[in-house]
Amino acid sequence: MFLSEAGARPRAGEASASERRKWVKVFKACDEDNKGYLSREDFKVAIVMLFGYKPSKIEADAVMSSVNPNTSGVSLEGFLSAVKRKKEARLYRNEIRQIFTAFDVHYRGFLTLEDFKRAFSRVAPKLPARTVLEVFREADQDSDGHVSFRDFEYAMNHGQSK
């Protein structure tokens, strides 16, 4: 039993028609020479336009590594796929934030074992106290008795990959 099994799954699904139109419009705006693809710099500008931040080198490298060797950039379909994945990751992170906030009833910015016990007693009342303690200890990365949002997010994502 791990935190991610409590139901925090990304909502996979197709982008709405209006979102897709917006993404295509941004792609076309950044593809100034109508090459049919976005260069690394074009891609970065497009991400700034859509998400409000410049992607890291690692993020840009990940997208550029999937580029067709016959072109010098990301095709429209590759761009749409990357943007969809990024949107889903953002939704999932927001969902994790909401779960953390629901656990943090005292608005301290961290969770204690008591917070875990209270939350799990509501969502899984038959769960043994030993299991709740194990989950808390696994989430408490530095064993300081507090689970920060970063600890919580890591635990949720770690549980997703199991």
From Swiss-Prot:
Pfam assignment, any one: EF-hand_8
Domain EF-hand: 18-53, 91-126, 127-162
InterPro entries, per the entry: Centrin_CML-like, EF-hand-dom_pair, EF_Hand_1_Ca_BS, EF_hand_dom
Example of a GO MF term: calcium ion binding
Annotated keywords: Calcium, Metal-binding, Repeat
Entry keyword Repeat: yes
Chain sites annotated for binding Ca(2+): D140, D142, D144, H146, D151
Record bears the keyword Membrane: no
Protein name according to UniProt: EF-hand calcium-binding domain-containing protein 11
Gene responsible for this protein: Efcab11
